[in-house]
Design a protein with these regions (language model features):
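A generic structural signal for alpha-helix starts
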Residues: 11, 66, 163, 228-229
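Structured loop/turn residues at secondary-structure junctions
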Residues: 8-9, 63, 119, 160, ...
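N-terminal Rossmann-like NAD(P) cofactor-binding subdomain of oxidoreductases
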Residues: 1-109, 212, 236, 244-245
Length: 246
């Protein structure tokens, strides 16, 4: 066995995931944020940090971090991010309850299909694992909503440089058509969440709602199929590891 994809949710730290290495696997890719992995990777953002000879327990981060990180990288590279807050409006997941039932998070304990549910997410802070220069600059929260798939990141950030809506969109479009092609998508059509079902990009910028206030405050909306997009990056990561290890 060359690579094990650890998707059970039970082995989300280096110590427990390393049991796969002990059993003969060369690499373990954890399909979630992980505690103490050798490296956390978002494809299209920081895969150059990955060294298959040194890194054996690898985290593919979360679907939300994979959506936020490409946008944050472009904004920080082009304009500089001073600080930012993110909200992910996220389809419900298996961690929630079908009916009101016990859960350590009293809001996630409520029936998932009938309420909008504010809850926590570490996705914004986790961006610093793939973009260390943003350490301490991003935070956020989640609102779980009664849709089965597709989510959207709403990022509001203060920038170092003055800019315009047009300049922000142009920077994101350039990245989507260039270095981040296949990971970041740029679109300006009046679409809704179901239209992105099956989209395999990590992040789909909704350029029609980009806003800049007083030159240095920017708001960017980015959609993501939190199942298909993430699974595709997981596949890409496995391929990248195997190719780089040759």
């Amino acid at each position: 066995v060359d690579a094990v994809v650890e998707s059970t949710g039970r082995f989300a730290d280096k110590e427990s995931a390393s049991k796969h290495i002990d059993a003969g696997a060369k690499w373990v890719i954890i399909s979630a944020p992980a505690k103490g992995p050798d490296v956390t990777v978002c494809m299209g953002v920081n895969e150059e940090m990955l060294d298959p000879k040194e890194h054996k327990v690898i985290s593919n981060a979360s679907c939300t971090t994979n959506c936020l990180a490409p946008v944050a990288k472009v904004l920080h590279h082009e304009f500089g991010i001073v600080r930012g807050l993110m909200t992910t409006i996220h389809s419900y997941t298996n961690d929630q309850r079908i009916l009101d039932l016990p859960h350590k998070d009293l809001r996630r304990a409520r029936a998932a299909a009938v309420s909008m549910i504010p809850t926590t997410t570490g996705a914004a802070r986790a961006v610093a694992l793939v973009l260390p220069e943003l350490q301490g600059r991003l935070d956020g929260m989640a609102i779980r909503v009664p849709t089965p798939n597709v989510s959207v990141v709403d990022l509001v950030a203060e920038l170092e440089k003055e800019t315009t809506t047009e300049a922000v969109n142009e920077a994101l479009k350039k990245a989507a058509q260039g270095t981040m092609k296949g990971v970041l998508q740029y679109m300006d059509q009046p679409l809704v969440s179901i239209d992105f079902n099956g989209n395999d990009h990590s992040s789909i910028v909704d350029a029609s709602v980009t806003k800049v206030l007083e030159g240095r405050m920017v708001k960017v909306l980015a959609w993501y199929d939190n199942e298909m997009g993430y699974s595709t990056r997981l596949r890409d990561l496995i391929t990248y590891i195997s190719n780089k290890a040759v």
